[in-house]
């Protein structure tokens, strides 16, 4: 009697963690349904930093953030809050510590980034020196 063993091949679609994503622009939502309010996070991953916008359509609240990816979280977050400016042409930002963002229950979207991301990228630009 001859017994043959063969390796079982398991194919699983593994979703990469935020830390393992290549540099680029991304969008995630807490719901794929378009007929109800949702939370959406748009971000740019560059080197070891993630800069983006966290916007909740249910509450109308949104903020800009910058942090470091760790597994499926963004940690060491700094948030940027837009403050009134004397001139309409210049946006001023107030920086404050923020809470980590977890992506375990968020879904990636194929669509590219929106205007909120580009606004938030300017909040964390280094100041120009004369």
Region spans (language model):
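Sec-dependent N-terminal signal peptides
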Residues: 1-3
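Tryptophan-anchored aromatic micro-motifs
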Residues: 13-37, 128
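Short beta-strand segments that buttress and anchor functional surface loops
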Residues: 26-32, 51-57, 78-80
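N-terminal glycine/threonine-rich, aromatic-flanked beta-hairpin/loop signature
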Residues: 34-68
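Beta-sheet ligand-binding and adhesion/scaffold domains
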Residues: 69, 74-130
């Amino acid at each position: 009697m001859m017994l043959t063993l063969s390796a079982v091949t398991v194919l699983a679609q593994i979703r990469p963690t935020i830390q393992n994503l290549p540099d680029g622009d991304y969008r995630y939502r807490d719901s794929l349904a378009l007929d109800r309010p949702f939370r959406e996070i748009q971000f740019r991953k560059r080197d070891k930093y993630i800069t983006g916008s966290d916007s909740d359509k249910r509450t109308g609240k949104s903020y800009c953030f910058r942090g470091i990816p760790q597994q499926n979280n963004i940690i060491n977050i700094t948030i940027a809050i837009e403050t009134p400016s004397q001139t309409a042409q210049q946006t001023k930002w107030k920086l404050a510590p923020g809470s980590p963002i977890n992506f375990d229950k968020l879904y990636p979207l194929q669509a590219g980034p929106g205007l909120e991301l580009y606004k938030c990228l300017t909040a964390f630009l280094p100041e120009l020196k004369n």
